[in-house]
Design a protein with these regions (language model features):
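Solvent-exposed residues in well-ordered beta-strands and their adjoining turns
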Residues: 46-48, 58, 77
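Helix-adjacent hinge/juxtasegments
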Residues: 45, 53-55, 72
């Protein structure tokens, strides 16, 4: 896929986010923010037998953070929690499909950070 198609997909996820909202009685919930640009993300998961059966996010911020959250929530439904623990920066960059500069990298990685903190059961992200 060309960079233009990836950019279109990112813009579409930003303008029409998937899985945005809240779940009724989520099994996992975590919230965090990026103080440098004001992005905020809350991730909620429903889990059965160690598998994500539903996922949602809520928050606000730049196009990259919100689109990444939307794309990530779609991708993780049906995956085992143990697999989510192994997701990394490269996974997010592959998901986005375009080069992300250093300034926007924290924006792109915030949804993953929030997801992994929730899956690992952290009360707060270690500084």
């Amino acid at each position: 896929m060309s960079d233009d198609l990836y950019r279109e997909a990112i813009l579409d996820h930003y303008k029409h986010p998937r899985q945005k909202g809240h779940l009724l009685a989520p099994d996992i919930q975590f919230h965090d923010h990026n103080p440098f640009c004001g992005d905020e993300i809350t991730v909620e998961l429903k889990v059965e037998n160690g598998i994500v059966v539903d996922a949602a996010f809520d928050g606000h911020g730049c196009a990259i953070s919100q689109a990444t959250a939307s794309m990530l929530m779609e991708e993780i439904i049906g995956k085992p929690l143990e697999e989510l623990k192994t997701l990394d920066k490269e996974y997010i960059l592959d998901l986005l499909g375009i080069e992300i500069g250093p300034v926007r990298l924290k924006c792109a990685l915030l949804p993953l950070k929030v997801l992994k903190a929730g899956v690992w059961g952290l009360e707060e992200w270690p500084e």
